Curated annotation (Swiss-Prot):
Keywords: Cytoplasm, RNA-binding. Pfam families: SmpB (PF01668). Belongs to the SmpB family. This is SsrA-binding protein. Required for rescue of stalled ribosomes mediated by trans-translation. Binds to transfer-messenger RNA (tmRNA), required for stable association of tmRNA with ribosomes. tmRNA and SmpB together mimic tRNA shape, replacing the anticodon stem-loop with SmpB. tmRNA is encoded by the ssrA gene; the 2 termini fold to resemble tRNA(Ala) and it encodes a 'tag peptide', a short internal open reading frame. During trans-translation Ala-aminoacylated tmRNA acts like a tRNA, entering the A-site of stalled ribosomes, displacing the stalled mRNA. It comes from the Bacteria. Gene3D superfamilies: 2.40.280.10.
Amino acid sequence: MEVIAENRKARFEYFILEEFEAGMVLLSSEVKSLRERKVNISDAYVTEKNGEIWLHNMHIAEYKAANKKKHKPKRERKLLLHKKEINKLISQIKTAGVTIVPLSIYFNDKGLVKTRIAIVKGKKLYDKRATIKQREWNRAKSRLSKNNL
């Protein structure tokens, strides 16, 4: 599994309730840009339209060597999931305070582009402070253990 992009902001901004793996419908120039790692998913989110799941606001830079089949960098991209997963996501989207965001994009073992999406709930400011405090404490512990060895 070769990770192309990761949404680190999502793990800080949200509580992750459940994760899914989804395929994406892409154009050839988009895949080539992904191989060059020219993608940004920090502001991306997932919505439902006509019983299908769509990824919005993901920026894939234009592939410079593409002649005719250039793509729009921020176009909507359809996500491929099983019907049972789609129904679960649609029911969660309608819940107040819950959203769906991509966590990472990667090439699987077969060379297909996959995205890991998650059902998330927003953190309050005090939750974010607690996360920072815990992270700093873990760093301090590791420094102390290195110095004691």
